[in-house]
Structures are given as structure tokens and as C-alpha cells.
């Protein structure tokens, strides 16, 4: 693990002691108030750093990883979240092992591409290593792309939602490794949305946003999910991936974890990540969740709802967020969830039901207007039942009954593959 957090915390210790001495010796009330503020800030920063420093991700544990790579040709599946301390994993390993190529998932190697944007192949300017995209037509490594590779290292930060596509990339990489007799090492990271909730993906709705028959919130790290994929035979044709997982140290299920790097352009902070499971299904509707603003997945609104809300936002084409957002250059009226005192935990239908009911008040053809991309909505949900139940006017508790039995079965299944308490 990088000694950067320790260095900073040592500096904070020194500054804290210095400020405390001045505070004690100062007779000025104004100075005391100011120094008290500075001292409190230092203590808060120190506590935050101490809490994060106790967690060692798989990539931080080079003492475990390097012996597994010695003398081997290595391919990496990484993006901008693949950090070893403050240094990218590729840069860390480049001078210590033979890296033959890098595979990049959705959003690209640097994590700056829009959702769904085509990613081109290229070459890393710093190391000269070829970079191959696993998003677009080629979502699975080809046999020719694994030629000369002995072991594949997978290190990407996930957010715990089934429709977040990094988990689908993991599935395809495992399948390719199994088919081509390659080892796979997963460098594990905590799950920031560590809940088990939502509908199980039905077979008819298998897609890149629903590759596996798991709940919308699966409650696993990618290391645990890799074990489940292997153990349940989901790779098909009796395939088994030669898998090793370097576990996270200092983290357990239910423990909050703030991501040090945003996992994708439109999940810029902890609030957006927490709301993502509940707001992402809006992508199958005519309601915006703030793409094209600097606060995506933190607001909800539509031009159609001017009569119901005072808060408004206007999606724009923004570099680094979204180039072509829904309702671009149109005022959207709705909710600012950044100001809400109480927000739902895990997955909730609260906002979907609220906005659909407002459309029903506004339009006789509310179903068509609201579910403007109904097929995409169903793929995100992994079932058409949620949409049908909403149209029938069912409450959230009534809708949840449809998946509760399957969810209980999944919870029992999940227990077999947990790597953490």
C-alpha cells in the first residue's frame, strides 16, 4: 500500500500539535476561535485518513501479487480506478513484470468516455503497452488477443449494481480465460453499495446490463462474484476459470467505503453512487436523472412537470460528464436530492412511483410518455414485471412481493461465496 496516507496523517499530527500549542498560549479570543476551527479540520481529516488507511485493496498488496506474476507474460483488465496507492497499477507493474497488453472496459482506460460511447484501441503513451477495448463489438477477449498471455489480472472498482457493466466485463474475461486456459487473478475491492435487494434478472432479459441471474443489488465484491460465477457454472459448457482472488484487508460487509476515485464520469461522488441503484431505471423513461449537469444521479426532473415542482435544472453537453444528455438545453422540473434530509437505502421504487403518478395526472397516455424506452427499462430491471405492476397501480410493498421469494434463495446462495464477514 502507498505510504501517502501515512505521510499526510503524520503531517496532520505535527500540525495538530503545533496549532494546539498556539491555541493554549494565545490570549486573543479571535485567534482562539480561528485556531479552534483549523484544529477541528485537522482532526476530521486525520480521522478520515485513518479510516481509509485501514483498508488495503487487492492492488495494494504487491507482496502477494508479484510472486504470482514472476516469469509470466501478463495482460491487465484495468481502468482509471486501478490504483495502487496513488499510482496506476500499469505504471506500478510495468518495470517489475512483463505486461503484454491492457484490456479496457466501458468508459475506457482513463474512464472519461460517456456511457455507451465507442472506445477505440490504442497504446499507452507512458509505457507503450497496447490497449484493447472490451466495449463495443468486442466485449470479450478474442483468442488471438490472449496469445502470449500466461495470466490476466483484473482490477476494476465496481459499485455493486447488476446493470453497472464492469461485472459483465468480468464475466466475459472469465469465460475467455477458461476457454483459452489462462489464469485469472482478481484484485478485490470493497462494494460501496453493499446491499442485497431488487428483482432477480430473468433469463429472457439477459444482456450486457444484466449478464447474470442475480438481484439488482447483489451484495458481493467482484472477487466474491467471480467465485459465484465459477461455482454456479454460469460460464457454460462446463467451463471453469483458473481463479485466484487477492482479498481486501481491513474491510467487511456492511462497512461504509468512500471511493477515492469516481468509478465512471456520471458517478462523481458518494451521493450519486448511493442513489444510482434507485435512479438508473429512469434511463428507460422520459425523466432525466441529471446527465448533462455536474450533479448526475442526484436530481430527477422532466420538462413535462413544470406545474408540480419549483426546482429546475437544464442538461447541457458537458465534457467529462455527458455529450448528448436527455432533454438537452431544456429546463427540467423535479427534485434536488442533494437537499433531501432522508434518502432511501439500497434500492427503492419511491421516486419511480412518484414520477409515474405525476405523469398519470398530467397525461391520459402516461404509460407511453413515461416509459419512453420500455424495453431498456425492462433490461435494467431484469424483468418486465416491475413496469407492469407500476402500470397497474401497485404499491412498492406489493411490487416487492413478486421478487421476495427468489431474493431469499439468492441470499442463501450468496453465503457460500462470501470472502468477508
Predicted features and spans:
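Glycine-rich, aromatic-lined ligand/substrate-binding cores of catalytic
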Residues: 249-328
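Conserved anion/nucleotide-ligand pocket segment
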Residues: 207-276
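Short internal beta-strands
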Residues: 100-106
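Bacterial N-terminal signal peptides
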Residues: 38-48
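Glycine-rich oxoanion-binding loops at beta->alpha junctions
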Residues: 120-148, 161
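N-terminal export leaders
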Residues: 31-35
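Glycine-rich, charge-decorated loop segments at or immediately adjacent to ligand/cofactor-binding or catalytic sites
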Residues: 112-115, 186-205
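Conserved functional hotspot residues or short segments at active or partner-binding sites
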Residues: 296, 301-402
Amino acid at each position: 500500500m502507498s505510504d501517502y496516507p501515512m505521510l499526510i496523517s503524520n503531517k496532520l499530527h505535527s500540525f495538530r500539535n503545533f496549532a494546539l500549542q498556539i491555541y493554549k498560549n494565545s490570549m486573543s479570543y479571535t485567534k482562539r476561535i480561528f485556531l479552534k476551527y483549523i484544529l477541528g479540520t485537522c482532526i476530521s481529516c486525520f480521522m478520515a485518513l485513518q479510516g481509509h488507511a485501514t483498508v488495503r485493496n487487492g492492488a495494494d498488496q504487491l507482496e502477494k501479487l508479484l510472486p504470482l506474476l514472476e516469469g509470466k507474460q501478463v495482460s491487465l483488465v484495468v481502468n482509471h480506478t486501478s490504483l495502487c496507492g496513488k499510482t496506476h497499477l500499469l505504471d506500478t507493474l510495468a518495470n517489475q513484470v512483463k505486461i503484454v497488453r491492457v484490456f479496457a472496459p466501458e468508459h475506457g482506460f482513463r474512464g472519461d468516455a460517456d456511457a455507451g460511447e465507442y472506445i477505440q484501441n490504442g497504446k499507452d503513451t507512458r509505457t507503450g503497452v497496447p490497449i484493447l477495448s472490451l466495449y463495443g463489438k468486442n466485449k470479450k477477449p478474442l483468442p488471438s488477443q490472449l496469445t502470449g498471455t500466461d495470466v490476466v489480472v483484473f482490477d476494476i472498482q465496481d459499485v455493486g449494481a447488476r446493470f453497472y457493466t464492469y461485472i459483465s466485463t468480468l464475466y466475459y474475461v472469465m469465460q475467455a480465460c477458461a476457454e483459452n486456459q489462462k489464469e485469472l487473478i482478481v484484485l478485490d475491492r470493497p462494494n460501496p453499495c453493499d446491499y442485497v435487494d431488487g428483482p432477480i434478472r430473468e433469463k429472457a432479459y439477459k444482456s450486457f446490463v444484466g449478464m447474470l441471474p442475480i438481484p439488482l443489488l447483489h451484495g458481493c465484491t467482484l472477487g466474491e462474484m467471480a467465485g459465484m460465477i465459477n461455482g454456479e457454472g454460469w460460464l457454460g459448457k462446463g467451463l471453469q476459470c483458473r481463479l485466484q482472488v487477492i482479498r481486501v484487508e481491513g474491510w467487511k460487509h456492511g462497512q461504509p467505503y468512500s471511493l477515492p476515485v469516481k468509478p465512471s464520469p456520471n458517478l462523481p461522488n458518494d451521493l450519486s453512487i448511493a442513489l444510482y441503484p434507485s435512479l438508473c431505471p429512469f434511463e428507460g423513461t422520459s425523466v432525466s436523472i441529471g446527465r448533462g449537469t455536474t450533479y448526475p444521479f442526484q436530481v430527477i426532473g422532466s420538462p413535462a412537470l413544470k406545474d408540480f415542482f419549483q426546482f429546475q435544472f437544464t442538461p447541457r453537453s458537458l465534457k467529462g460528464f455527458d455529450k448528448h444528455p436527455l432533454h438537452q438545453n431544456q429546463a427540467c422540473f423535479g427534485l434536488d436530492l442533494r437537499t433531501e434530509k432522508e434518502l432511501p437505502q439500497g434500492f427503492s421504487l419511491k421516486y419511480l412511483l412518484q414520477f409515474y403518478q405525476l405523469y398519470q395526472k398530467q397525461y391520459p397516455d402516461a404509460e407511453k410518455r413515461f416509459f419512453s424506452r420500455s424495453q431498456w427499462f425492462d433490461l435494467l430491471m431484469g424483468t418486465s414485471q416491475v413496469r407492469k405492476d407500476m402500470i397497474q397501480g401497485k404499491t412498492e410493498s406489493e411490487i416487492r412481493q413478486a421478487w421476495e421469494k427468489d431474493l431469499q434463495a439468492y441470499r442463501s446462495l450468496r453465503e457460500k461465496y462470501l470472502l468477508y464477514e
